Amino acid sequence: MSRSLRKGPYINVKLEKKILLMNESKKKSVVKTWARASMISPDFVGCTIAVHNGNKFIPVYITENMVGHKLGEFSPTRQFRGHAGNKKK
């Protein structure tokens, strides 16, 4: 279910502040965040954000196609090992 239009998108305040400061200074550096639920806004385009997946930080380069999605969508938390197969004798 999508978020109410009355509430607006959720963007972590600290993350947004770091991105705005980085855009003003025109220095491109990786920003670490644990805020996987934050929505990607147009201000984030061109930045690299390291999103925590529970174990390590996954660097995510933000493009225009990612606007409107959440940061956690681009940092998988589980590793698929494959289904069980037939054991050969």
Swiss-Prot record:
Cellular component, GO, one term: small ribosomal subunit
Pfam families: Ribosomal_S19 (PF00203)
Keyword Ribosomal protein in record: yes
Keywords annotated in UniProt: Ribonucleoprotein, Ribosomal protein, RNA-binding, rRNA-binding
Keyword rRNA-binding: yes
Molecular function as annotated in GO: rRNA binding; structural constituent of ribosome
A biological process from GO: ribosomal small subunit assembly
InterPro entries: Ribosomal_uS19, Ribosomal_uS19_bac-type, Ribosomal_uS19_CS, Ribosomal_uS19_SF
HAMAP family: Ribosomal_uS19
Functional note: Protein S19 forms a complex with S13 that binds strongly to the 16S ribosomal RNA.
Record PANTHER family: RIBOSOMAL PROTEIN S19P FAMILY MEMBER (PTHR11880), SMALL RIBOSOMAL SUBUNIT PROTEIN US19M (PTHR11880:SF8)
Family note: Belongs to the universal ribosomal protein uS19 family.
NCBIfam families reported for this sequence: rpsS_bact (TIGR01050)
Protein name, as recorded: Small ribosomal subunit protein uS19
Organism: Azobacteroides pseudotrichonymphae genomovar. CFP2
